[in-house]
Curated annotation (Swiss-Prot):
Keywords: Nucleotide-binding. One of its GO terms (cellular component) is cytosol. GO terms for molecular function: nucleotide binding. The keyword Nucleotide-binding applies. This is Nucleotide-binding protein BceJ2315_27070. Nucleotide-binding protein. It comes from Burkholderia cenocepacia (strain ATCC BAA-245 / DSM 16553 / LMG 16656 / NCTC 13227 / J2315 / CF5610). Belongs to the YajQ family. The keyword Nucleotide-binding applies. Pfam families: DUF520 (PF04461). It comes from the Bacteria. Gene3D superfamilies: YajQ-like, domain 2.
Amino acid sequence: MPSFDVVSEANMIEVKNAIEQSNKEISTRFDFKGSDARVEQKERELTLFADDDFKLGQVKDVLIGKLAKRNVDVRFLDYGKVEKIGGDKVKQIVTVKKGVTGDLAKKIVRLVKDSKIKVQASIQGDAVRISGTKRDDLQSTIAMLRKDVTDTPLDFNNFRD
C-alpha cells in the first residue's frame, strides 16, 4: 500500500551555513563597524546580538536574506522578545521550529478526511502518515495539502510504493 509522511522540518545544515554567511556579511558591512552585532547558534536556538534595536532589525534582515537564498523557509523561525543585556546592547532569541504540532496534525487529518480522496491519515509522533491504494490519490492529496496549509511549511518524504 503506497504511503508518505507529512513533516515540517528545516534543513539545519543550511541554517548553519546561512548563519555563517550572515556573520561574515555583518563583519564586513560599514554600518556595523565597531559594533558587537552577530548571530550565534545552539542546536535549534539562534541568538541575535546588536548594539540597539535598529541594528538588531538590520541583523534580522541580513539573516532572513541569507536563509531565503539557501532555500530555508522563514516560517520555521519563531521570534522571542527583544531583551536588553546591559548598556544599549540587545539580544533576541529565535527558535527554529521542528515537527508537525498536534493542532496542525489534527488539521491535516481533518482536511484529508473532508477531501473525499480515498486515503487514510494517521498521526505518528511529529509526522502524519498518509496511505492509500493508488499513487494518483496520494499525489492529489499532496497538491491539496500544499494549497490548503499555508501557515506552516510542509515537506513530504518517505514516499513508498
